[in-house]
Amino acid sequence: MARHTQDQTSVHWREGGKASRRTFLKSTVGAGSALASFSITRSGWNAKSRPRWQSHTVARIPEGYQVAVADVNGGGRLDVLALSSQKNIVDWYQNPMWHTRSVTTSTEDNISLAPLFRRGYPVQGMALASGFHLDHPEQGGDIWWAQPSASLDAEWSLTRIGRIPASHRLRWADLDGDGRVELVDVPIVGAGSRPPDYSVPAPIMWFQMPETLLTGHTASAGQQSNNWIPHLIDESLNIVHGVLVMDWNGDGRDEILTASTQGVNLFESKGRGAGLQWTKTLLSPCDQSSDRYHGASEIGVGKVQGHRFLATIEPWHGNKVVVYTRRTRGFSERHVIDTSFNNGHALVCADLDGDGNDEIVAGYRGPGTSLFIYHSTDERGTRWERETLDTDMAASCVVIADVNGDGRPDIVAVGSSTANVKWYENLGFA
């Protein structure tokens, strides 16, 4: 088993009183919402507390690229979904025995998946992006709506709902606060981009779901495809790699944060439906001094002592984990907390130990294949301690979810060269 160590002071923690209670505030978690929101209460926990972790193998998958969780079969447990970027594999694994079932084997060069399984929501299924070709983006970019079949063992029915070259990240978001979600599609580059600069900006889009799906009236595949209406959000950013959907400003609608060559940008909307109007705000330019690529490629948001911070991997597929804390003029205070990454590709923020402060979970795909947890050691989020979670995880994607239903946030990750899907069980206090 890969080692699990703390890179600095070794500490053990004990629970004061009975097990803490964590309650999901949202019933859907996926690659598009890497963190399920928890309401956490605890007593008797000190600032040096650390959860214990136990790794479990979910599956082997060649060149694993994206992972998500959702209650696919309605069994009350979060199942795991994953795809391979090299093989025509899009699978889901049924919790708790992790029986492998195929979503589809008919798509190639898969790149992103966004499950939609919300309790009480009128439609269930998954958005899937395939045909990814970074160096020749116009050769692909297919976007699919996949609906489960009546049999758990049957592949899902696919409807192509759009084609946007270099589609790279799919996310569900309630963009106008009406309780219905829209599909956000973020290409990494624009059509016509070529290496090494990839200079054509990416058209960030959102799709309105067909009314026929939302009302439960069955339509033909062709009608469904035509009714997924695309709308442009922005077309000014290059190499848009990281995407985070969250209610940034507490207005009851989801905002979009991106990590790109230009740094971290926030997109906020006003209006309703097809009339949405967008405002872009630069939160941080990030790394603009590297020789080849600039900006950031992953973005996470957390809080320490109630103060928000940004966490990034810099630059594109870079070697640095960076934290930005807020000063009078935005997130202008930069703290490089790790420079050891080799092809950094996974990052999420979450309160893993219930102390009210968020940790950072981040990993990389290159030699060393490691996944780490970073713990803040001061009240401002300027100093961090690294804990090694796994050295057998070439982390391409990581999400946080309560996998076993014990109320604790667990970690789920997929590895590329390590060809694995794992979940890391939060065992609580020793």
Q: Model features per residue range: what roles?
A:
Residues 1-19:
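N-terminal secretory signal peptides
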Residues 13, 17-23, 28-430:
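Beta-propeller-forming repeat regions
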